[in-house]
Amino acid sequence: MRVPRQWSGADLKEALSVLGYEETRQTGSHIRMTTRMRGEHHVTVPDHRVLPLGTLRAILRDVARHFECTSEEILTRLLGSG
């Protein structure tokens, strides 16, 4: 599955809520999100209009590592929710 190229920080924030991530704080244009599913895990999401593809892939890879699955599986769960 291809990574969406026009996702904003707000889009990613909304999608990550499916996996139990909640906004815990915001500093400037960066949002810190935390999940307590399968242990506590934090990711920082830039609140930009369009996320750079490498940034989006890195966040998905980090989330996948936490949930012990592939980035493809995470992306399927996120896109399947909407």
Put a short name on every predicted segment.
Residues 1-27:
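N-terminal first-folded block
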Residues 9-11, 15, 41, 51-53, ...:
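Residues in flexible loops and secondary-structure boundaries
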Residues 51-82:
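C-terminal structural segments of small proteins and small subunits
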